[in-house]
Every structure is written in structure tokens, then in C-alpha cells.
Amino acid sequence: MLLSVMCVAVSLLLLPSQVAASTVTLRVSQLQGNLTAALRERAAHLGPADHLVLYFDRAGTFTIEGTVEFACNVEIKGLGVKKTTVVLDNGTDRAGFKAFFDDTFFKVSASTSQPLAVSIHDLSVKLKDHNGIWWDGAEKYAFKLCNCAPVSIERFNCTLRNAVCTNVDLRACSNVTVRNCTLTNYNNCTTGGVLWLRGQMHDIDISANTFYKYGNDECVAFFGADAPVPGDIKRYNIKVANNDFYYVNRGNGPADLVNGVFFTYYVGTSTPATVGCASSNVDISGNRFYMQGLCHTIMGITFSERDTHDNVVIANNYIENSPVAGDQKIRHCDYEVTDLNAARIPITFSGNTTVNNAAFVAPWGASGYCHLMVHGGAIVDLGKSSLTDNVATSSLTTQRLGCRLLSFDNAGGTVNMTGNSFSGLGMLASIDYGDGIDGKVTINADSNVFTGDTRIYCRNVKTVDLNFVGNTFNSTTSNFFLQEFAQQGSLVFDGNMVNTPGNGQLMTHWDNNDKAARRFNKLQVRNNVFTGVDGERTLLQPITNVRSRSVAGNVYR
């Protein structure tokens, strides 16, 4: 035993090239002097073949005042999150000791050819309490790991407040496990997130954690192409499951601070145009999002022209939007999906639940709440999900609120809906974007329940194909389905149950354009039960330009 200790002590005094690979256990209780300086000195003698165990082996609070960088495999551990606390301090220059001058406190930097293993567990880390916003305009990180594998972060608490700083930044790291952690970032400013993963990666498991965020920037983000890899970036076997996410004002900032995008999966506009990302087996499931502050988009999924994807599933998640005090108008979207790749592989949303208790009012006074926004011609399969919007009025507007279930940008897109239940609707779909929609919009709906204002609004759109079969419409208005139509398109409306207050029409025509300009290449309305519709003539009254028509077997009550 004595010989083993002596060998370790000797190895710390030699350069890595002078000794064989070693395992070094560094007990913080045995270090003297400034902790940051001592850790730097010990780490400087270890290389990629070595393994360092940094053990905070006594209960208490320890301070790190500068960057500690490891070029070896490292395990950082304590006695438990309630017994071991590491405080990150901005530091000051004194006696030749450099304070925090880099962009991160703990850094592990490896290469793609020789990744390093990292384990962090059983301790708490927090930024020192302070006034004002630290590092405004110069983003920092508590932990930055580059080209590391495997990475295990478990039973770990990390809290940052009032700083442009991100808790954990993983760059081109694989075989990553983040589990049973509580990660908090109340940056109270424009920049800084909680857990960011960049570049090429595989076998990622982020499960059973609790995330707290307030301020702009993503809580959890997959993005970037930071690893110099040949060809396209590859990401596969990504799982984010059974986590609790809170967007809540518990910092010192204003209550009306807006978060842009809370959770994202993308590559990013800074990636070279010649580089794409091949994603497969991406599972975002069983998570709970409690949104207690202003946020533009809760979850954004984005694929560029060169990106490919397969088996991307967002399932069994729960979203709850809570009321927000104040009088700020805002546009809010639960999910935004962008897919610019021509392959058009569907992205699956299944079994998700959304409950809205917030009054989202757009700057122009209408409802500012959208459930799913489709960009770039994406295809979305939306099944077995539910939405309940409980807010119909607000002191900020005289207009009635309600959720806009679907929206599309100028490239159009396809949404396939099966077995869903949506209530409190302000509009079933808005097919209206800027100067017009050039791409084709397709909505296929089977066995859904739509409750509220169930209109599909079309404006300046070239082509729309609608296929609604076996659905239930509990409409609060007589305009229960179409408000205007595309320049051309088709409508199949079969086997639906429609309940309206009276004088129901399949399409209403309110704008100044000639209604004959709306061309139904195919109009099929069969075997529906209409309550509150006087008959076929009233039902189809504004529809005059039909190429192929089949209307039969309908019941009017």
C-alpha cells in the first residue's frame, strides 16, 4: 500500500512522456494552498493515457476561481449533492495567480482519434452569488467537454444565476449519460443555457432529470457542427426521456423576460452549406414541460437542405402553459417543425398532451397561440394527442382567443392527424403566410375530435388538399370548416359528425375576391351527419367552381 502511494506521488512530478499510464486519486482534503492553483498543477502532469480521480472527500464548500483544464480521463466526485458544494467564483489576480480568464471553469479537451472518458457525480456546483450580470457580452461555461466518450453525469446539481453562462456544454461527445441531475440556469439575460450538445454524437441518454430555466436561450439544445469530421455529421440513438422542465422566474430578473426557443434540435445556420447532419433514432418522450413565463417556442425541430433524418419521434410529452402576470403581448408556439430536405420523411408526434392556461395575445390583438407551426414543406404525423385551451378572453384584447392548431409558412407542408382530441380551438388551421403560400398544403385527418372554432382559413395560397374522414366537429360557429379556399385543390369530407349552432356552411366567403376563383378540382362530401345545417344547398352555397363533384348520403338535422 505504501509503495502504491509513493508511485502515485512520483508520477505527479514527472512529465507524461516519462511515465507509464497511471491512475491518480487526488483527495481535495490533502491539498494545501489555493485549490484552483493546486488542481492546475496536478492536472498539467497527466496525459490522455492517464486517469485522474478528483475526489472532494470531505463535506463542505470549495471554491474554484479559474479554469481547470484536464487532458486526461477524469472522474470528479463528491460525497453527495447535499454534502459537497463547489462554488465558481470570478476570481481576482493576485501573487501571480491568474483568475478566471478563459471561457469555462472545468474543461476536458480531447481529440477525435483519442477521446477521453469523463464522469461527474455526487456533488453540487453553483455560481457565486453576486450583483448584476456577470460576463455580459462574453459567454462562459461551467463545464465544457470536447471529444469525450463515454461521459457520465449523474446525481449532480448545478445552479447558475445572473450570468451569461451555460451549465454544461458537450462538443462532439458520445456515449453520454445525464441522469438524476438537477440543473438550473436563471441567467436573467439574453444568453446562456443549461445543457447543450453540439456536433457529431451517438448514444445519448438524458433521463430522469429536472431542469430549471429563466431568461433567453435554450434550456436543452442539440446543434452545431463543431467537430472536424469528413462528410456529413452523424447523430444517432438520441434519447431525451422522463425529464421535468420548468421555465419559471426564480431569479432576480424582470417577470416579463422572454425566452426565444426553450428546447431545440438542429444543426444551425453557421454550419457550412456543404455539411449536413444525418439523424436517426431520435426519441424525445415522456417529458413534462411546465411553462410559467413568456416563451415564443417551447420545442423547435429543424432540418436543413442537406440534413437527413429517420425515426424522429416526439411522444407522450406533457406541456402546461401557466398564466403569466403582466400586459405583454406575445406570439407563442408549442411546437415548430422545419424540414427543408427534399426527401420529406415524416416526423412523428404521438401521445402528447398540452394544457394551456395562458392568455397569448398577438401584437395586433388576435390570438397569439399556435400549437404546431410547419416550415419548409415538412411532413408531420400527429396522432393520439390532446390539446385543451382553457383561455378564451383577455383584458389585452376585445377579440376572442383560442388556439390556432396548425400554421404553415410559404413552403406549405403536410400534417396527418389520427385519433386526436383538440378543444378550445380558435382556428383549426391557418393557411396564410406573408405574401402568400407557394407550396402545397395537405391536411389528412381521420378519427379526430375538434372542439371550438373549427375553421380552416386560407389566404393567397396556391394549392390545398384536405382529406377529413370520420371526425367529430363540435363547432362554436356556423362557419364550421372552410373560410375561403386555395386557387385550386381538393376536398374529401366523408363520414364526419358535425355540430354547429345553426346556418352551418362548409365554406364561407368573406373577402373581396371572386369566389369562383377558388377551384375545387375534387369535391367529395358523403355520408356525414350535419346538425345545425339546413340542407345541401345551404351547406355548399358559396362553392361554385367545381371540376369533379360527389355529394351523397348526408344527413341534415
Regions found by a protein language model. Give the residues of each.
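Extracellular beta-strand solenoid repeats
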Residues: Y55, T63, E69, E75-K77, ...
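Parallel beta-helix/beta-solenoid
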Residues: E75-K82, K98-R161, T177-C181, S207, ...
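Bacterial N-terminal signal peptides
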Residues: S4-L14
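N-terminal extracellular ligand-recognition/capping segment immediately after the signal peptide
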Residues: S29-R40, P48-E75, L79-D93, V125
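Extracellular/surface-exposed low-complexity segments
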Residues: V525-F530, V546-R557
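Boundary at the C-terminal end of the N-terminal hydrophobic targeting segment
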Residues: V19-S22
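Extracellular beta-strand/beta-solenoid scaffold signature
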Residues: T36-R40, E65-T67, N90-S111, N131-L145, ...
